[in-house]
Amino acid sequence: MAITVNLRYTGKNGSARNFAEEMTASGTVAAIRAEAGNLRYEYYLSFDDPETVLLIDQWRDQAAIDAHHASPMMQTIVALREYEYQQRGHACLSGNRAAAC
């Protein structure tokens, strides 16, 4: 069963948006999308709060998420996390009909 992870990045002075833009421009987003088990990896900007970016990240199963977290890709992401922002998130199984998912 697919697992969707919603991550909300909030910062100041455009830091969350800059992080998402660098993830995309550096090719990191494309590399994550190419990982085995990744079904979706998309950033969305908020109309209500220009300092907030939403990442919708979907994986085939927990094993795919675990492989991603254990991969060298995580070091690439950590290196880009020099931006000042906060991250909140939650995960939902694909059959979950909760409004937040």
Residue ranges, per PLM feature:
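Short, well-ordered beta-strand segments in beta-rich or mixed alpha/beta enzyme
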Residues: A2-T10, R40-A70
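Short low-complexity stretches enriched in small and charged residues
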Residues: L7-S15, E21, Y44-D48, R97-A100
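Short amphipathic alpha-helical segments
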Residues: S15-L39, M73-V78
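Short, low-complexity, polar/charged sequence segments that are solvent-exposed and flexible
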Residues: T24-T28, R60-A63, M73-T76, Q87, ...
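Glycine-rich beta-strand-turn "strand-cap" elements at beta-sheet edges
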Residues: R40-E51, Q75-C101
